[in-house]
């Protein structure tokens, strides 16, 4: 019984946003800060002010001055939101679904190298959540193509469903399950549920093998909100408006629940 309750704790550090766009906005924010500090007195500004503390009239003055000064150029006044949305801690039901959980564990550590057929790293680091459906789920883990059309596993491609995982229910927000294309077609793709209540339509069709730890649920909330910033949801309402990337991942430890 103790072995059935074995839990492995893993983590996914998620970045949300376009890195190039973020770097550009950060540079423009620094432009504004540097101008205020070095030349703000020419506009009658307190040089100790932060860009975000300027009123609209002051912002217009700085914007116009920087546009005509080749040393500075474009500016933004509000500091861009950090790319790092936070850490999701996942509790894997290793006692109930040992094969599925071992596959996931190895994919977060990257310890198995590259796939024999795919020749791609068996590692979630750098993978995107390519599909996010508001109030339903977010799906990622395609270590081969990154777009949800493929996947791989430490077992050399597809592996079978574990019956105990098929019996577990999607009981609420933060359930961790295996994405598939039918019976016994598990690879590396997985999903996290975003629905507050049960998702009975998924029960018995997908292997449930873990959950988000309660302390990580606020991070999930933040990721879902930022995924649809500005109301853009892709052509079919399933694409995040900005990239959601697993920037880091690993194992935290093992315990009995």
What are these regions (language model features)?
Residues 1-257:
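Cross-family detector of peptidyl-prolyl cis-trans isomerase
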């Amino acid at each position: 019984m103790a072995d059935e309750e074995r839990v492995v704790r893993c983590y996914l550090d998620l970045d949300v946003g376009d890195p190039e766009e973020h770097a550009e906005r950060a540079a423009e924010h620094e432009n504004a800060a540097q101008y205020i500090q070095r030349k703000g007195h020419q506009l009658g500004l307190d040089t100790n002010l932060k860009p975000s503390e300027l009123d609209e009239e002051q912002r217009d003055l700085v914007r116009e001055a920087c546009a005509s000064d080749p040393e500075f150029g474009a500016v933004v006044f509000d500091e861009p939101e950090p790319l790092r949305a936070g850490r999701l801690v996942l509790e894997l039901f290793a006692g109930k679904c040992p094969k599925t959980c071992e596959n996931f564990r190895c994919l977060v550590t990257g310890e198995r190298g590259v796939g024999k057929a795919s020749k791609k790293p068996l590692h979630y680091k750098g993978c995107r959540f390519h599909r996010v459906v508001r109030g339903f789920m977010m799906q990622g883990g395609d270590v081969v193509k990154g777009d949800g059309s493929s996947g791989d596993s430490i077992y050399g491609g597809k592996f079978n469903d574990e019956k105990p995982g098929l019996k577990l229910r999607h009981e609420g927000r933060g359930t961790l399950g295996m994405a598939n294309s039918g019976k016994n077609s598990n690879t590396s793709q997985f999903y996290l549920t975003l629905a507050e209540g049960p998702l009975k339509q998924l029960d018995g069709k997908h292997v449930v093998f873990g959950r988000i730890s309660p302390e990580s649920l606020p991070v999930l909330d933040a990721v879902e909100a930022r995924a649809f910033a500005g109301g853009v949801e892709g052509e079919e309402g399933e694409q995040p408006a900005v990239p959601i990337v697993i920037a880091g991942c690993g194992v935290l430890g093992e315990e009995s629940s």
